[in-house]
Swiss-Prot record:
It comes from the Eukaryota. The gene is Timm21. This is Mitochondrial import inner membrane translocase subunit Tim21. GO terms for biological process: mitochondrial cytochrome c oxidase assembly; mitochondrial respiratory chain complex I assembly; protein import into mitochondrial matrix. Belongs to the TIM21 family. It is found in: Mitochondrion membrane. Its main location: mitochondrion. It comes from Rattus norvegicus.
């Protein structure tokens, strides 16, 4: 009987414990849920507090956020500006050096052109003097040879046609006529020497001719033309020495 009573008491305790757990479990769950949701409510309240503008003396205070300059962008802009300035300075230096080179090149070309023009002018003057001037040794030679070809005594001694040539070189080539220039009483004189021969075999003559500048006309007139023939014979083609003196 005592054992039955003890069993009843244990059963009653088990029932009481299970009922207590069933009653405490909803309360614990609700309490835990409240604890979990309470920070969210607090956060919402704080957010509402920060969002709501405050009123000071009837004016609504608003918060404005201004975004400052980005240091990276400022650094990039400064580097770009530095590179642009550097490029401009390099371009300026290159353009200056290029201008100096071009100026030096132009001066060099100008010097070369002037030198070429001076040489060309001197050559043209020499050619004109040799071909057309009355003081040219070649002109004097041509005129003297022409007078010898028409002179009767020269034709009879040498025969026709009479040919003229200059000094003989070592290689047997006939070079230009030899001439000498000198002045007498302020007047220029030119003396030439050349050789003639004709159809007569073994006949050769040496021609001596001299011209003097005419102060009135500026031309050169013959003073004399002599032809030396061996042995010790001279043919006077023209002699104006006494007339000019």
């Amino acid at each position: 009987m005592i054992c039955a009573f003890l069993r009843v008491v244990r059963h009653a305790e088990k029932l009481h414990g299970s009922l207590g757990r069933q009653l405490l479990l909803p309360h614990f769950v609700l309490t835990k849920a409240c604890l979990k949701t309470q920070p969210l409510r607090w956060g919402l309240r704080e957010q509402k507090k920060t969002v709501q503008p405050r009123t000071v003396l009837g004016f609504t205070q608003k918060t404005f956020w201004t975004q400052g300059p980005d240091p990276r962008k400022a650094k990039e802009d400064s580097s770009k500006q530095v590179s642009i300035n550097r490029n401009q300075r390099e371009e300026t230096g290159v353009s200056t050096s290029q201008k100096v080179k071009e100026a030096g090149r132009d001066v060099t070309y100008l010097i070369v052109v002037l030198f070429g023009v001076s040489i060309t002018g001197s050559l043209l003057y020499t050619i004109f003097k040799e071909l057309f001037s009355s003081s040219s040794p070649n002109i004097i030679y041509g005129k003297a040879l022409g007078k010898c070809r028409t002179h009767p005594e020269v034709i009879s001694v040498f025969g026709e046609p009479v040919k003229g040539y200059g000094e003989m070189s070592r290689r047997g080539r006939r070079q230009h006529v030899s001439f000498t220039e000198y002045a007498n009483n302020g007047l220029k004189r030119i003396r030439v020497k050349f050789y003639i021969e004709g159809s007569e075999p073994g006949k050769q003559g040496t021609v001596h001719a001299e011209v003097e500048e005419n102060p009135r006309s500026g031309q050169f007139d013959f003073r004399y033309i002599f032809v030396d023939v061996a042995p010790k014979r001279s043919i006077v083609v023209e002699d104006n020495r006494f007339q000019q003196s």
